[in-house]
From Swiss-Prot:
Residues 8-282 form the tr-type G domain. It is found in: Cytoplasm. InterPro entries: EF-G-like_DII (IPR053905), EFG_II (IPR041095), EFG_III (IPR009022), EFG_III/V (IPR035647), EFG_IV (IPR047872), EFG_V (IPR035649), EFG_V-like (IPR000640), G_TR_CS (IPR031157). NCBIfam families: EF-G (TIGR00484), PRK12740.1-3 (NF009379), PRK12740.1-5 (NF009381), small_GTP (TIGR00231). Pfam families: EF-G_D2, EFG_C, EFG_III, EFG_IV, GTP_EFTU. This is Elongation factor G.
Length: 693
């Protein structure tokens, strides 16, 4: 089957936003106007095409990123709809990793909200070009220019309108195109009849002012345009569009559009902007990776002629076809029935069938080409972030960063029959979602699940019940603490046992130093002269990793520590891997006496919105919860307070805020970083954990 759309005519985009900005409705309208669906599904009625899981339709939020393919103006647009709720951050991260561009949807009344900041920061990390769609222009309190100002103030983004709204709230009736300098007036409810007219006289001055600002902002990113602009020459519409495209693709400029997806206004113009300003796979730098045989860096340009290379970015269990692996093809061509090499795992995989996805319906295809996003059936060993490549041209692409879980719950099956089913269900859910961890407490035999927030675990327990028919009792949420060292030290681990026959002997000297935050555990072998034989070095590292999993203070995993093995000794007969593993763990225990071990707790960035008169209460809440205020701003009659507060202090806060503000206050929290707990709290945690032992 020949390629239907050239690479130049392919767009891989994500739709990202804060929860409730109207992102899923926007995607629905895109599917409607591109001819994928013939009746529009409203999210608040629970009928949305992209939100196909039962929980999504009940809760009206998007949990998994559904991928779909649509066509617009002779282009193929692959769309990934991502969740806006902070508990599902990994879904956003893995989507951004495989996208070339994104549409950031804002609620025009609120502008940039906490989760918008999170997804924006993630998109910046991955270098993803973006356009901004200020949605809900029909909503009471909608304010387009306020939304634009929040892009500058809260995100420091070089964002400028390429459109202006005509009217707002109930009176929102059209859009001014600042490039063509024409007005697009909507004359029917479905948004399919659009009249192009001259700009109404009362909007002309504003339109000219913002066109001038737009030209100036774009000219600043392009020397040739800047020269023309300074010399007073006219910049043509074509030059302006080309300048916007170039600056957007270079992530130097963010065009801002407006509309109301719910009222069917502005979505087609936004689709035009996706084609005009977001990159094709050819416009972005070629993907880099490491050749596992030579350790050399290699690139894979976007081309069907190059060897096949793809990244698996999502695993899903489908009730009809079983395990689905979503992947993005960066180079080459793949046919169903062929074999690929999973270079991350070193395993050969057979591609059974290839499916092009549309939310939860699917179309079987024979071939995928570079730049495509598709799903494969039949992969057994592949997990999120794995590289799939041609067996003769190996490459390991950069994987997906997985954030550490911050909250945990104990789950126990209600009956013996549920016991076996629960193990299978949890394993399948963990395969789909790398931020969901399942562990068994060795001493008590309890199953502990960890995730990114209460809603995250709630949804997973719910899925366990519905999809796998497992009934379970769930404990109260607990905070996922971590441990680390705050000082450097050197410590010996010496293990010797002699009891008839072959003995055990292991002797190591290890230097422990604090590592940078987020860098995890790093092991360095600095042995010279073979005082610890090479075959025992991995055992030393393994012994440390296993011991660090249970910490040195209160049984929590240790993070951000460097360990340098620099000396030791061995016995020709009695030394073994086991002996060196034990010696390494004894060295860690010894180090704990002088390395100032500390317990770390997750700190949340909490954004609280309350009426002016409740500001004092909120400041009191933050202080009482060991928090610190980071900033405040007024928005209408409300105050928005941003603060860093330990997660441990936030359980039950929704009820406290509700009663303090008579139900008018709201808050959002997102994990920000780990921080040392105060000494008094640390002692309490240690006592509590020792008591449980």
């Amino acid at each position: 089957m020949a390629r239907e759309f050239s690479l130049e005519k392919t767009r891989n985009i994500g739709i990202m936003a804060h929860v409730d900005a109207g992102k899923t409705t926007t995607t629905e309208r895109i599917l409607y106007y591109t001819g994928k669906i013939h009746k529009i599904g409203e999210t608040h009625e629970g009928a949305s095409q992209m939100d196909w899981m039962e929980q999504e339709q009940e809760r009206g939020i998007t949990i998994t990123s559904a991928a779909t393919t649509a066509q617009w103006n002779n282009h193929r647009v692959n769309i990934i709809d991502t969740p806006g709720h902070v508990d599902f951050t990994i879904e956003v991260q893995r989507s951004l990793r495989v996208l070339d561009g994104a549409v950031t949807v804002l609620d025009s009344q609120s502008g940039v909200e906490p989760q918008t900041e999170t997804v924006w920061r993630q998109a910046t990390e991955y270098g993803v070009p973006r356009i901004v769609f200020a949605n809900k222009m029909d909503k009471i309190g909608a304010d387009f220019l306020y939304s634009v100002s929040t892009l500058h103030d809260r995100l420091q983004a070089n964002a400028h309108p390429i459109q202006l709204p005509i009217g707002s709230e109930d009176d929102f009736r059209g859009i001014i195109d600042l490039i063509k300098m024409k007005a697009e007036i909507y004359t029917n409810d479905l948004g399919t009849d659009i009249l192009e007219e001259d700009i109404p006289a009362e909007y002309l001055d504003q339109a000219q002012e913002y066109r001038e600002k737009l030209i100036e902002a774009v000219a600043e990113t392009d020397e040739e345009l800047m020269m023309k602009y300074l010399e007073g020459e006219e910049i043509t519409n074509e030059e302006l569009k080309a300048g916007i495209r170039k600056a957007t693709i270079n992530v130097e400029f963010f065009p801002v559009l407006c509309g109301s997806a719910f009222k069917n206004k502005g979505v087609q113009l936004m689709l035009d902007a996706v084609i005009d300003y977001l990159p094709s796979p050819l416009d972005i730098p070629a993907i880099k990776g490491i050749n596992p045989d030579t350790d050399a860096e290699e690139i894979r340009p976007a081309s069907d002629e190059e060897p096949f290379a793809a990244l698996a970015f999502k695993i899903m269990t489908d009730p009809f076809v079983g395990r689905l692996t979503f992947f993005r093809v960066y180079s080459g061509v793949l046919q169903s029935g062929s074999y690929v090499l999973n270079t991350s795992k070193g395993k050969r995989e057979r591609i059974g069938r290839i499916l092009q996805m549309h939310a939860n319906s699917r179309q079987e295809i024979d071939t995928v080409y570079s730049g495509d996003i598709a799903a494969a059936v039949g992969l057994k060993d592949t997990t999120t972030g794995d590289s799939l490549t041609d067996e003769k041209a190996k490459i390991i692409l950069e994987s997906i960063n997985v954030p550490e879980p911050v909250i945990q719950l104990m789950v126990e099956p209600k009956s013996k029959a549920d016991q076996d089913k629960m193990g299978i269900a949890l394993q399948k859910l963990a395969e789909e979602d790398p931020t969901f961890r399942v562990e068994t407490n060795v001493e008590t035999g309890e199953t502990v699940i960890s995730g990114m927030g209460e809603l995250h675990l709630d949804v997973l327990v719910d899925r366990m019940r519905r999809e796998f028919k497992v009934e379970a009792n769930v404990g109260a949420p607990q905070v996922s603490y971590r441990e680390t060292f705050r000082a450097s030290t050197q410590a010996r681990g010496f293990f010797k046992r002699q009891s008839g026959g072959k003995g055990q002997f292991g002797d190591v000297w290890i230097e422990f130093t604090p590592n940078e935050e987020g860098k995890g555990f790093e092991f360095e072998n600095a042995i010279v002269g073979g005082v610890v034989p090479r075959e025992f070095i991995p055992a030393v590292e393994k012994g440390l990793v296993e011991s660090m999993a249970n910490g040195v203070l209160a049984g929590y995993p240790m993070v951000d520590v460097k360990a340098k093995l620099y000396d030791g000794s061995y016995h020709d007969v009695d030394s073994s891997e086991t002996a060196f593993k034990i010696a390494a763990s004894l060295s860690l225990k010894e180090a704990a006496k002088s390395a100032q071990p500390a317990i770390l707790e997750p700190m949340m960035l909490v954004t609280i919105t309350v009426p002016e008169e409740n500001l004092g209460d909120v400041m009191g809440h933050v202080t009482a919860r060991r928090g610190r205020v980071d900033g405040m701003e007024a928005h209408g009659n409300s105050q928005i307070v941003r603060a860093y507060v330990p997660l441990a202090e936030m359980f039950g806060y929704a009820t406290v805020l509700r009663s303090a503000s008579q139900g008018r206050g709201t808050f959002m929290m997102v994990f920000d970083h780990y921080e040392d707990v105060p000494k008094s709290v640390q002692e309490e945690i240690i006592k509590k954990n020792k008591g449980e032992d």
